[in-house]
């Protein structure tokens, strides 16, 4: 109707609420200036003449397109608002929530033991009983039984997993299930826990015996096995005597409050109590600084320095004496050590590290070296001390006359230095 009105009218703006004649249009815009909306000719032609001359096919076509666009847009908007959109994904929220509730209740182990859940073993046994009564519906029933069987298998697997988790984290509650293997399994952990609660050696033996007595039982849960207490918690040293709950030094804050804490204390007491054999041995035997194999290499206790004493005599910033200050030792000679002036023996303490000036005249400390290191060579006897101003070359093979035989003449005169031609052999 709007398009027809636009075609019949003489002005394109008439269908939008104006009158059907140019006079009505002019009356509506009479208050406006003629130059504000329409451009006049130089000759001053009125606006009505321009409007009447502008009527043509272009204006009518544009008006028709505009009105058809508005009509289609309004209809599309109305349909979009009224028509409900289809969901691309269908979710059965009731079934999903039921699954979640069943799974959570199975994990928590709060469900009381009831009839055994249907499994894949009993579903084929039920189907042949119903097949003779309705043989004509056998094919459709078989087609519908496949998803039901898969659902029952999934439910059985979920119930088995929930039961195993409940048995793992709850040792005092029985494993739910009315089957005979489950009953045997419940009896075995009960016997193991009862024996372990005594705290003696009988509990350690009764646990495995009760677990292995039933051949048809399933795998024993981890908490029901006879495992040492150190498997679950880190062991700590005992704080007091006795094998009761107050024996081990374990705080109740680290464990659960209730029967499990008491059971843990009773299990931990015999192993880590202070009255056990290991604790008595540790308290009675002192700590040996040296290992057992090193006792063979040790000498008499008089010759060994103290544990925290300084090292032995260090003469001239050397731990070991010079080669010419140690006499050659004879392995067959074993005589008590006698010092001419020091008076040192094996059972007496060492003399001062640096002897007085009277003991070593002329700055020669040959005898002082021997006196300082005498206890470390018990098999060697000290030779008589040399004269004050004469050095002996017999202390070592490296400085003997045989090594420097070319410097001695046949008459025993030294040929070494120019000022020592008259020196005779000693």
Swiss-Prot record:
Q: Which InterPro entries match?
A: FAM181, TEADIR3_omega_loop
The lineage's top-level taxon is Eukaryota
| Region Disordered, annotated ranges | 106-157, 226-246
Compositional bias annotation for Low complexity? 128-141
UniProt lists the family membership as follows: Belongs to the FAM181 family.
**Name by which UniProt lists this protein:** Protein FAM181B
* Origin species: Homo sapiens (Human)
């Amino acid at each position: 109707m709007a398009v027809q009105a636009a075609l019949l009218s003489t002005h394109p703006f008439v269908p939008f609420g104006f009158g059907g004649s140019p006079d009505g249009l002019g009356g509506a815009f009479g208050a406006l200036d003629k130059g504000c909306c329409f451009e006049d000719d130089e000759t001053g032609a009125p606006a009505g003449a321009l409007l009447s001359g502008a009527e043509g096919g272009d204006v009518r076509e544009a008006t028709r397109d505009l009105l058809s666009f508005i009509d289609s847009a309004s209809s599309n908007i109305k349909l979009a608002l009224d028509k409900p959109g289809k969901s691309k994904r269908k979710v059965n929220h009731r079934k999903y929530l039921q699954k979640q509730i069943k799974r959570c209740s199975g994990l928590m182990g709060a469900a009381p033991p009831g009839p055994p859940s249907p499994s894949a073993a009993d579903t084929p046994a039920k189907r042949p009983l119903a097949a003779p009564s309705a043989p004509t519906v056998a094919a459709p029933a078989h087609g519908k039984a496949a998803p039901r069987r898969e659902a029952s298998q999934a439910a059985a697997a979920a119930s088995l997993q929930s039961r195993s988790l409940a048995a793992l984290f709850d040792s005092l509650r029985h494993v739910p299930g009315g089957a005979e293997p489950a009953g045997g399994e419940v009896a075995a952990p009960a016997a193991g826990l009862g024996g372990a609660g005594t705290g003696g050696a009988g509990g350690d033996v009764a646990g495995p015996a009760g677990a292995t007595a039933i051949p048809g039982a399933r795998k024993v849960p981890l908490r029901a096995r006879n495992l040492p207490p150190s498997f679950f918690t880190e062991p700590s040293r005992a704080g007091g005597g006795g094998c009761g709950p107050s024996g081990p030094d374990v705080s109740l804050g680290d464990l659960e409050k209730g029967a499990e804490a008491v059971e843990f204390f009773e299990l931990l007491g015999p192993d880590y109590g202070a009255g056990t054999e290991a604790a008595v041995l540790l308290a009675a035997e002192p700590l040996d600084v040296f290992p057992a194999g090193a006792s063979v290499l040790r000498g008499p206790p008089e010759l060994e320095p103290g544990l925290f004493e300084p090292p032995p005599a260090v003469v001239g910033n050397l731990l070991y004496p010079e080669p010419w200050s140690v006499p050659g030792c004879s392995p067959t000679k074993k005589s008590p050590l006698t010092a001419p002036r020091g008076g040192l023996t094996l059972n007496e303490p060492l003399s001062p590290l640096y002897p007085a000036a009277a003991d070593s005249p002329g700055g020669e400390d040959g005898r002082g070296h021997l006196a300082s290191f005498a206890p470390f060579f018990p098999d060697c006897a000290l030779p008589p001390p040399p004269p004050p101003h004469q050095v002996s070359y017999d202390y070592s093979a490296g400085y003997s006359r045989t090594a420097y035989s070319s410097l001695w003449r046949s008459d025993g005169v030294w040929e070494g230095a120019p000022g020592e031609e008259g020196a005779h052999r000693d």
